[in-house]
């Protein structure tokens, strides 16, 4: 369970107009913050150890699902609240981009095979309890075979029961990264690729130095934030022209919940595995067999799919599995710990950080119980 929130910062002087801001880490948070600050007229420099493609970012591998009710089974109420916030905030953020990014809110479908019905019953009870406890979560819909077929015609006669979680969504993370890169170019952000940095490289506020430093490096910040750890995820991308799904589908499994997230043009992102490890070696044979076998049991059309990618990445995770913002020096903010919920909670962390910079305090962080602390 989460600990009590750390008291918010003492009020800080708002960021002056046309301030110079250095951002470390061009993953999801770093790009979002760079774009927002540049649009407000600040002079932004973005540093990253990898390339513009974001090949070192956990967010590039993710399925980018926005599923607060589904994730309530494995996370805390404040993360669920951040997920509800993100569902409304993402369309506003996407509207600022120079090119369209796939986004939909068709809900989440949960299905299971007959032998896994007891696990599904426990999951249903847990989700129903969470829905009653967290304001704003929609009531799930219990489906029979006809209901599953109506929700996903491609799964007709494949599952006797299912659960539909209305209003949940997803976006295309690869399209988003490209659109953010174009936005940053257009906004005049100075981007430094293959240029690792750490807070000690600058003295913010001194002549010739940035006014603020924002550290969004994920696991790259481990030397300065030693409680960070990596949680390995393994994901397979398939092109399956014979399969059409309208929404992310989760398969109840005795060991883990497998998800199938459909993107445009019959591209599917399949994942589930979560391993306590900093290991970024290629996907294991066991995970490959389990993920592909599970996909085939959901829809036999995956048998003729083509494997486009098999990826691994480690998500930056704090001991309580919750995100945090901390000030490690008078003008240095560190943002980290998005764990497996990156896209679902990034808008809240992004907006809270902007409030801290522009107002000196964050009512949003207090409302969402997002940890903000001095160290």
Q: What annotation goes with each model-predicted range?
A:
Residues 39-59:
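Glycine-rich FAD pyrophosphate-binding loop
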Residues 20-45:
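N-terminal Rossmann-like FAD-binding beta1-loop-alpha1 element of flavoenzymes
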Residues 305-375:
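C-terminal catalytic lobe of FAD-dependent flavoproteins
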Residues 32-40, 65-66, 101-104, 217-330:
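Active-site substrate-recognition segment that forms the wall
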